[in-house]
Amino acid sequence: MTISIVTGGAGFIGSHIVEKLKRLDHMVVVIDNEYSDNDNFHWRKDTLNVNIDITDYKALKKAFTGADYIFHCAAEARIGPAIENPVNALNINTIGTCNVLQCAREVGAKKVLYSSTSSGYGLNEAPLSLIHI
């Protein structure tokens, strides 16, 4: 059976990825720390739900053991908390992502899918063309 891990898998985007993976008969491990006060968490009874912060390297590596695929959706995506505590946002979004990539490499995961942000595109002139996409 294919084992897929979804970091941030109890959040909005991650939970939809989990739903699709379950329909594809993957064994899914959801990693989330339930930190965000504003999100509705979507823990499922048919997944292994692990409460881990992606900045905890040792715990993350243990949870990744045996994984075929990693879907990385965990992040501090909200603007308010990032402005209030930029060091924490940087730690989660940068060090946490480095931990995800390093653990995936060390356990021999086949692929990592990284869900970034629309902010990565920057400001573009309207209308958009295929060059901007």
What role is predicted for each listed range?
Residues 1-130:
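N-terminal Rossmann-like NAD(P)+-binding domain of SDR-like oxidoreductases, especially those catalyzing
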